[in-house]
Structures are given as C-alpha cells and as structure tokens.
Amino acid sequence: MILIGNQEFYKGVGKIQYEGKNSDNPLAFKYYNPDKIVAGKTMKEHFRFAVAYWHTFCGQGGDPFGPGTQQFPWDQASDPVQRAKDKADAAFEFITKMGFDFFCFHDIDLVDEAPSLAETEKRLEQITEYVAHKQKASGVKLLWGTANCFSNPIYMNGASTNPDFNVVARAGAQI
C-alpha cells in the first residue's frame, strides 16, 4: 500500500517493482526481487532495507566547499512542525513506494531543533504523534531512532564526554 499525505511528492511514480536485469525502466529493481527465495528465505527477509531520514530527506548537498543547493518541496512551510509533517508525508510516500519495511532517524531529523531544549521537546512530541500515525497506517516500522548529540555546536567538545557538565546534562536530557 502506498501512503500519500496531504500532497503527493513523487507524482507519476508508482510502487517500484522488480522487472529483471533487462528492464530499461530506471524506476525498477533489476536484481532485487523481494519474493525470490535464496538459501531458504526471500530476498526481502535477507535484505531488511531501511530508509535513513537524515540521508534521504535532510541532506541539502552541502560540503566543505559550500552550502547545500538542493531544495525540497517538503521543506517549504515556514512553521517548523508543518515542515516536519510535510517531510514525514514525503518520507512515508517514498518508503511505501520503494516497498521497504523500515526507517531510521535522529531526533532532529524529524523536526528542526529549536533555540531551547524545552521547545525542541515540544516539537518532537507533536511530530512523534504524527509519525506514529504514519507508521500505523503504512505498516512501516522503526529500525532505530536516536539522539543527534553531535550537530549542534554546543557538542563541539563531545556530549557525554564534554568537560562542561551543563553540556553533559543537556545531552542526557536530549537522550
């Protein structure tokens, strides 16, 4: 089942199917056939693919030579929680069109970090409820979720190993 949110982000793209190595369809699996039995298990059982939020929906193409230039349609709303909901809609549409069963994320991949930890927690509560609904509707499961205790400059000297105990305490609260 393909899960589409308030808008379709990947218009014209249906569920990605296995078509074999001779297919010229760029949106088809050439070698991965989820139903093929290999060593007593289906390929789907052997290859438990997970879509990583950070790499798939958050990266904007930045590198040491300059900022990112990729702009995504789910990253347009001015309200950070709405932007996070749009990203979740795009994510679950993508995951279900790919036919994958799992996703993974860092906390601030789901929703932008706020100026304060308390406000970040409020945002996380809102998006967590929304994502849980998406999981239930799609059957997509969480492979892992964790705290990003490295991107914020406050963690420049580490999180749990930071010499400033205020930073250690913040990391503990974030986790």
Where are these predicted regions, by residue range?
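N-terminal pre-domain/capping segments
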Residues: 1-174
